[in-house]
């Protein structure tokens, strides 16, 4: 009897040993798979496909940087995007950025979120490959407690892991109107940024505040001024202009301008200042005759530094004289592009000798949006086109983004979120005549940046989709009750080349920013999503 019992005991011991060995060998694999499945819950197919951070094509980094360093961007750090929007002309043209997908043929979009959160991320800039700068904290709720900000942060360009963050304000404590700011990198790598009536210079390596100044706001009180618009002149002088919140409005955020204007409140006139890029000394200040809600651009005109300003009634031209340290208005050049029923024009764009304007920047229930071009030498020489035709009963035209231009291809791109369409327009640069080349169904209120070479230009568009289809567009926009995706399109035809999954909304008024190695960055209310397009993998047998 003893022997069978011993054999049974030995068998039990062997089973236990084998079970323990199996546990030790297999449990890490089982755990890893379980953790992977848990981590994948809530991810979109684009994120599942990436399964981790996206470095992009690292073989392109030095080539793209060398290309960018050859571009004429005086006043700005030479990188793929060292300015709020490419350069002083805010051209939105990124010829050194690479589209890594197939121009014709199926593509796969990969996406991955930043490791750290950046509330209200709005603009993202590159310096060297691997370096990413983010402005955020400037997209608060309209009322109630607001997040601290604005802030500037530096992050790893692949993981989104924060390196440093510098907070500039806290509206709960200061009482300041906190609205959108922008981000520009100086040639020496430092950062100049402004908000409310304040301007600071930051060390681009450490985030330390090097200089600060308070800016005059002219005819409008400081409580309703926001020096969001900052552009650098060819001589290096920083030209700033403020947005103004309607008098009596107490809402926070940039959308306060639209919401309170729709309630009949009136904006005060804007102010423009010239500031030294190193000392932040105010060199000159000039009051504008009316509000200027949209950004200005800077270009050379007949040997002078010209500043084209979109104002609520149209567009004006100012000159900056570095020798005299003087800002002045050119009263011979005034454009009034709006027809009865249309609203303010958006920020101007340049195409050859023409200044391009988009109407209905704050919306119209009665008249469709139009594109107007005015000659730089003669403001009376204008042409107009209605790319989407007349406004139908019950439609709302809302076209807040500036028109995108492509001088090499003589193309203009117009986006009207209200009617849910984007148009490609061909301009005859000799005569100013325009012809609509294509109209596509794509609802966006964002910029329309262009990537790559002249013969294979790629148009980047966000695409807005309401979560409740029957919900009025205005309500969905004001409450953020919608999702948004990125589409990559053939800029010549509007044809979709690739499209991402739908994510939370792109931060209002921000840019889908091209990065090194074929990546783009999609800023959101929580941080950013890096994306890359690659040719779709062939199916494995």
What are these regions (language model features)?
Residues 16-109, 533-541:
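Sequence/structural signature of beta-propeller modules
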Residues 496-541:
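Blade-level signature of beta-propeller repeat domains, shared across WD40, Kelch, NHL, RCC1
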Residues 135-149, 242-266, 360-368, 462-481:
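Short, conserved, GDST-rich strand-edge loop motifs in beta-rich repeat architectures
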Residues 117-123, 136-141, 147-190, 196, ...:
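Blade-loop segments of beta-propeller domains
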Residues 64-152, 172-182:
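Beta-strand-rich domains and repeat architectures in extracellular enzymes and scaffolds
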């Amino acid at each position: 009897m003893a022997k069978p019992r011993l054999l049974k005991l030995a068998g039990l011991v062997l089973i236990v040993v084998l079970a323990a060995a199996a546990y030790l060998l297999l449990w890490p694999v089982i755990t890893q798979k379980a953790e992977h499945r848990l981590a994948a819950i809530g991810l979109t197919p684009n994120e599942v496909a990436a399964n981790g951070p996206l470095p992009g094509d690292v073989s392109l980094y030095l080539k793209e940087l060398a290309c960018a360093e050859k571009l004429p961007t005086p006043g700005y750090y030479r990188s793929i995007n060292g300015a709020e929007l490419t350069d002083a002309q805010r051209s939105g043209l990124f010829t050194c950025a690479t589209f890594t997908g197939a121009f014709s043929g199926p593509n796969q979009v990969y996406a991955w979120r930043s490791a750290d959160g950046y509330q209200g991320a709005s603009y993202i800039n590159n310096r060297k490959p691997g370096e990413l700068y983010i402005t955020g904290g400037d997209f608060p709720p309209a009322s109630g407690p607001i997040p601290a900000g604005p802030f500037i942060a530096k992050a790893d360009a692949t993981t989104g892991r924060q390196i440093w963050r510098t907070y500039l304000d806290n509206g709960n404590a200061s009482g300041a109107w906190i609205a959108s700011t922008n981000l520009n990198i100086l040639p020496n790598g430092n950062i100049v940024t402004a908000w409310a009536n304040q301007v600071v210079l930051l060390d681009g390596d450490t985030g330390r505040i090097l200089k600060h100044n308070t800016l005059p706001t002219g005819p409008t009180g400081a409580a309703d001024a926001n020096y969001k618009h900052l552009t650098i002149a060819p001589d290096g002088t920083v030209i700033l202009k403020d947005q103004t919140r309607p008098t009596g409005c107490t809402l926070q955020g940039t959308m306060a301008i639209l919401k309170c204007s729709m309630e009949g409140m009136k904006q005060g006139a804007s102010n423009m200042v010239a500031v030294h890029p190193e000392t932040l000394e105010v060199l000159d200040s000039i009051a504008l005759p009316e509000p200027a809600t949209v950004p200005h651009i800077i270009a050379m005109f007949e040997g002078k530094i010209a500043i084209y300003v979109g104002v609520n009634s149209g567009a004006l031209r100012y000159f900056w004289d570095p020798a005299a340290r003087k800002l002045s208005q050119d009263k011979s050049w005034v454009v009034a592009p709006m027809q009865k029923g249309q609203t303010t024009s958006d920020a101007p764009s340049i195409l050859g000798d023409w200044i391009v304007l988009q109407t209905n920047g704050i919306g119209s229930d009665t008249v469709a949006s139009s594109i107007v071009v005015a000659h730089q030498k003669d403001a009376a020489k204008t042409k107009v086109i209605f790319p989407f035709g007349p406004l139908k009963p019950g439609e709302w035209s809302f076209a807040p983004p500036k028109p995108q231009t492509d001088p090499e291809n003589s193309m203009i791109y117009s986006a009207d979120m209200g009617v849910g369409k984007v148009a490609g327009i061909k301009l005859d640069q000799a005569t100013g005549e325009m012809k609509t080349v294509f109209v596509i169904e794509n609802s966006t209120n964002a910029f329309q940046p262009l990537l790559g070479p002249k013969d294979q230009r790629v148009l980047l568009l966000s695409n807005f989709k309401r979560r409740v289809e029957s919900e009025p567009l205005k309500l969905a926009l004001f409450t953020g009750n919608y999702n948004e995706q990125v589409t990559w399109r053939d800029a010549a035809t509007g044809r979709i080349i690739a499209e991402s999954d739908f994510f939370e909304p792109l931060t209002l008024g921000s840019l889908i920013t091209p990065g090194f190695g074929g990546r783009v960055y999609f800023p959101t209310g929580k941080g950013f999503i890096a994306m890359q397009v690659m040719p779709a993998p062939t199916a494995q047998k």
